[in-house]
């Protein structure tokens, strides 16, 4: 399971008359202090102070005590005062009444962190009928038991879409201890931070790159990571397009992060002229065998049994008609079908395909992503450009 046990410190501070006078377990709202990565939560006559502002403290599973060895719970490790002292000072600055109370109880509590911060739900790709419901925090807790129970019963969750938490989403490169620990260390202090939607990871980059990577770097490519793959978002070499199309930066600084007007210029130029698009990150699979076309037809909504050389774009649905994926399927031979899907869904789609394959050995599955690459030449002038490189008829 791609996760690492990570410490979240919490201390119970009290007693305080102002809290005891409420005569309730919770009489005041929870306070979330985004600047210091702390929260304060009433617990009867005490205040619980939790922090994500301390250094990342990760533990190997072998370091976690057994039920017999643990003083109270295996998830409660010995408290490290030095890590919490700065957090306590900021909490007192926010609520000075805390300075007159004492720490009654404190722990280094363990929670699970994954490489992309999402839970690990579903049947494991490695072991059939071994199910995971791990790295579920309070924010995901409600409904997760129902979702996983439905998944185990029907083969897919029915109550909500949890594809972003499907454990099959991870590629091999994301399952190594080095990757899991690096991502947990980088993300921990952002748990209570304000993270830009397009913000990129700093560590563990260039795990998978296309064959044009060095040339793209020469052109000043700005890469975003899609799971393990690096994809260029815009090229510094195209900066002249900003002036050509009269473009400018966005007014708000936040909106300019992880963005450039160059990408708009490239889009406009592609619509008027043409452009080359790197599609190396797309995942490519092949089904072969006497049952390949029949099985592919069963997977897809659209008809896959088309003339050889034709391709289709199609959804994949579950038996309730719920949406699983959308992708391209190509009939390459009488008994051969190619599947091309997006990098973010590649792991899930591969597992779905393997999980539902016929058991009579009439179909074989092969992942050929790293054997092929794809470039798209798009735009109204694409045929004219390509005609300079080939004598093939491009009318179709």
Please describe what each predicted stretch is:
Residues 1-27, 159:
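Central helical "cap/lid" subdomain
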Residues 10-12, 30, 39, 120, ...:
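Conserved hydrophobic/aromatic beta-strand scaffold that supports enzyme active sites
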Residues 19-25, 99-105, 308-313:
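Short Pro/Gly-enriched beta-strand edge/turn motifs at strand-loop
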Residues 19-50:
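Conserved FAD-binding catalytic core of PHBH/FMO-like flavoproteins
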Residues 35-36, 44, 55-62, 66-208:
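C-terminal catalytic lobe of FAD-dependent flavoproteins
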Residues 39-41, 47-51, 132, 231, ...:
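Short hydrophobic-aromatic micro-motifs
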Residues 42, 123-125, 329-333:
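Short, low-complexity Ser/Thr-rich regulatory SLiMs
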Residues 160, 164-396:
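Glycine/proline-enriched, intrinsically flexible loops and inter-domain linkers
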């Amino acid at each position: 399971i791609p996760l690492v046990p990570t410490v979240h410190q919490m201390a119970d501070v009290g007693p305080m008359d102002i809290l005891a006078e409420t005569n309730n377990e919770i009489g005041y709202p929870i306070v979330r202090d985004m600047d210091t990565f702390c929260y304060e939560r009433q617990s009867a006559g005490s205040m619980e102070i939790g922090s994500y502002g301390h250094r990342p403290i990760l533990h190997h599973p072998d370091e976690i005590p057994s039920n017999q060895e643990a003083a109270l719970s295996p998830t409660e490790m010995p408290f490290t005062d030095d890590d919490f002292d700065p957090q306590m000072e900021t909490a007192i600055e926010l609520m000075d009444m805390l300075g007159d109370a004492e720490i009654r109880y404190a722990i280094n509590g363990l929670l699970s962190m994954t490489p992309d911060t999402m839970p690990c739900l579903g049947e494991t790709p490695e072991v059939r009928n071994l199910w995971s419901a791990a790295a579920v925090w309070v924010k995901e807790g409600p409904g997760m038991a129902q979702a996983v129970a439905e998944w185990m019963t029907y083969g897919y969750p029915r109550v909500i879409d949890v594809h972003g938490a499907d454990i099959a989403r991870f590629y091999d490169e994301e399952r190594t201890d080095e990757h899991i620990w690096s991502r947990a260390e980088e993300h921990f202090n952002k748990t209570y931070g304000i993270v830009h939607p397009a913000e990129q990871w700093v560590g563990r980059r260039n795990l998978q790159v296309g064959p044009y990577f060095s040339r793209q770097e020469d052109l000043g490519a700005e890469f975003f990571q899609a799971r393990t793959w690096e994809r260029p978002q815009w090229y510094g070499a195209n900066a002249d397009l900003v002036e050509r199309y009269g473009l400018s930066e966005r007014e708000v600084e936040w909106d300019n992060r992880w963005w450039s007007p160059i990408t708009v210029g490239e889009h406009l130029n592609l619509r008027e002229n043409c452009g080359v698009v790197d599609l190396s990150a797309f995942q490519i699979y092949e089904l072969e065998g006497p049952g390949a076309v029949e099985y592919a037809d069963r997977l897809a909504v659209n008809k896959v049994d088309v003339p050889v050389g034709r391709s289709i774009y199609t959804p994949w649905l579950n038996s309730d008609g719920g949406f699983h994926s959308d992708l391209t399927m190509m009939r390459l031979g009488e008994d051969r079908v190619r599947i091309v899907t997006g990098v973010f869904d590649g792991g899930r789609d591969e597992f779905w395909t393997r999980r539902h394959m016929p058991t009579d050995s009439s179909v074989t599955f092969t992942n050929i992503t790293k054997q092929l690459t794809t470039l798209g030449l798009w735009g109204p002038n694409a045929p004219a450009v390509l005609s300079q490189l080939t004598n093939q008829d491009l009318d179709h």
